[in-house]
A protein has these predicted regions:
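Short cysteine-rich clusters marking metal-coordination/redox-active sites
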Residues: 165, 177-180
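Basic/polar N-terminal segments that are highly enriched at the extreme N-terminus
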Residues: 1-2, 195
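Short microdomains enriched in Cys/His and/or Lys/Arg
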Residues: 181-195
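Structural signal for interior beta-strand "rungs" in well-ordered beta-sheet cores
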Residues: 2-96, 100-154, 158-160, 166
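Intrinsically disordered, low-complexity terminal tails/loops enriched in metal-binding residues
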Residues: 115, 172-174
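Cys/His-rich microdomains that often coordinate metals
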Residues: 160, 169-172, 183-186
Length: 195
């Protein structure tokens, strides 16, 4: 753990967790062994970060968020309060023979979230999903399929309703951002920045 990291006394940071410089971990959060959190992150209260989860630098994970084994967050990712990033598409408590599942019985299918994406409050992202950079997941959305870079998705199941700028504002019909003036174009179904 970096000397400049700040960990609340009620947080449970297990042995083998890597915490970067100037990262702050608030009350009652639990980071399990093998987890890695980059520099300049804020981990809110009561956050759960499971085994081997990777969190990039300059991320903000709000209160009560749950990041399960297999989750990888790029730099500058926002995870809203109560959001849940899962890791098992076919969960069961027991094996077909009726015995309780052990760690080795789980097939982990993690979630990958690229740089700058934002996941809204109480959104659920199922295992195996890839969230493109600078995308925006609406509050309460249930994401069952990959989200393209800059895509805005909402609902249950989540569906794309538009495109987001790097600054977070939605793009207009001409793919221009009213917030910062950036201009985009669609090329082979991918949004690319022109300026």
């Amino acid at each position: 753990m970096a000397d400049t990291a700040a960990v609340h006394p009620t947080a449970d940071v297990e042995n083998g967790v890597s915490v970067g410089k100037r990262t702050r971990i608030w009350a009652r959060s639990h980071l399990r062994r093998g987890a890695s959190v980059g520099d300049d992150c804020i981990i809110g209260e009561n956050v759960f970060i499971d085994l081997d989860v990777q969190v990039g630098s300059r991320c903000k994970i709000q209160n009560n968020a749950l990041l399960y084994h297999g989750v990888v967050l790029g730099d500058e990712v926002f995870v809203g309060p109560g959001a849940c990033l899962t890791n098992d598409r076919y969960p069961r408590a027991s094996t077909p023979d009726g015995s309780l599942k052990a760690d080795t019985d789980w097939v982990v299918s993690g979630v990958v979230v690229e740089r700058g994406a934002a996941i809204g409050a109480h959104a659920v992202v199922v295992g195996g999903v890839h969230i493109g950079g600078w995308s925006m997941i609406g509050s309460g959305a249930v994401v069952t399929h990959d989200v393209p870079a800059h895509g805005i998705v909402v609902g249950n199941p989540a569906r794309r309703i538009g495109w987001a700028c790097r600054c977070g504002h939605p793009l207009d019909a001409m793919l221009v951002c009213a917030g910062c003036g950036r201009v985009y174009a669609l090329r082979d179904s991918e949004l690319v920045e022109l300026n």
